[in-house]
């Protein structure tokens, strides 16, 4: 029961984390314009992994996709790759973990096969969560670097006496969604790996005394003592008295009470 519960909880957490990773990858608010010390408030800009958007004070929003691949920063392309790899591994892990549930029987599949499938799905979930967390963290580090570079350029004119207008970007909502989703997927993978231990058959060896069914030539030897039933090989050379098998001379030398009539 505990193994099934651990599997189901791990699957649900991983499924929720995978949905969060997909949502974060498709969101446009990976970076949002910092409005602090910005005199222009009628225009709000934000960017995602696939396009950049401009929102006006009237409520009209215009988005423009990135029409180039080679012209994009290498960090942005790396983040894209990490998020896509995390999503693909998460989808495969979900499919494997569904068939690995202990409460689902498929043909003659035993617990050892389900244990291997559970461990495989758990490892996939862990890698998927790590990819999502690394991708979001790399993008966040890029934002922090650009933010402080833009801040330094704002106060560089005329010895810092003249402030120039610079567009600075800060963390968007997609970063927090990606961090939470990656953490949930990672926790789900750990729980699936823990559930694998409950499905693994116990192969430990225990010391025991071998027992054989009793027979004519069976001898039990505990600690050097030998006991025999009397019907073994040692008893074959012994002469056994048989009152029913006598010769004629034996009958004459050993009369019975019926001989005196």
From Swiss-Prot:
The chain crosses the membrane at residues 7-27, 81-101, 123-143, 174-194. Pfam families: PMP22_Claudin. Expressed in the lung (at protein level). One of its GO terms (cellular component) is plasma membrane. Residues 28-80, 144-173 are extracellular. Residues 1-6, 102-122, 195-261 are cytoplasmic. It is found in: Cell junction, Tight junction; Cell membrane. The keyword Transmembrane helix applies. The modification Phosphoserine is found at residue 214. GO terms for molecular function: structural molecule activity. Gene3D superfamilies: 1.20.140.150. Belongs to the claudin family. Involved in alveolar fluid homeostasis via regulation of alveolar epithelial tight junction composition and therefore ion transport and solute permeability, potentially via downstream regulation of the actin cytoskeleton organization and beta-2-adrenergic signaling. Required for lung alveolarization and maintenance of the paracellular alveolar epithelial barrier. Acts to maintain epithelial progenitor cell proliferation and organ size, via regulation of YAP1 localization away from the nucleus and thereby restriction of YAP1 target gene transcription. This is Claudin-18. It comes from Rattus norvegicus (Rat).
């Amino acid at each position: 029961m505990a193994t099934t519960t651990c599997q189901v909880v791990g699957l649900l957490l991983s499924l929720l984390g995978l949905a969060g990773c997909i949502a974060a990858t498709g969101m446009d608010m990976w970076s949002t314009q910092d409005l602090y010390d910005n005199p222009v408030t009628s225009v709000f800009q934000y960017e995602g992994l696939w396009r950049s958007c401009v929102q006006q004070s009237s409520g009209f929003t215009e988005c423009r996709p990135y029409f180039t691949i080679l012209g994009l920063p290498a960090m942005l392309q790396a983040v894209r790759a990490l998020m896509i790899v995390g999503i693909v591994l998460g989808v495969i892990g979900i499919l494997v973990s569904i068939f690995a549930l202990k409460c689902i029987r498929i043909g003659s599949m035993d617990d050892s096969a389900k244990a291997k499938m559970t461990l495989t799905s758990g490892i996939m979930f862990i890698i998927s969560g790590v990819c999502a967390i690394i991708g979001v963290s790399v993008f966040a580090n890029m934002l922090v670097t650009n933010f402080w570079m833009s801040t330094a350029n704002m106060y560089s004119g005329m010895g810092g006496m003249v402030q120039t207008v610079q567009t600075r970007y800060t963390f968007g909502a997609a970063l927090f969604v990606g961090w939470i989703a990656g953490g949930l997927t990672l926790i789900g993978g750990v729980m699936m790996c823990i559930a694998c231990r409950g499905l693994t058959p116990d192969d430990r060896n225990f010391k025991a005394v071998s027992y054989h069914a009793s027979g004519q030539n069976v001898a039990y030897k505990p600690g050097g003592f030998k006991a025999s039933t009397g019907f073994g090989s040692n008893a074959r050379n012994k002469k056994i008295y048989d009152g029913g098998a006598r010769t004629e001379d034996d009958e004459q030398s050993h009369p019975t009470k019926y001989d005196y009539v």
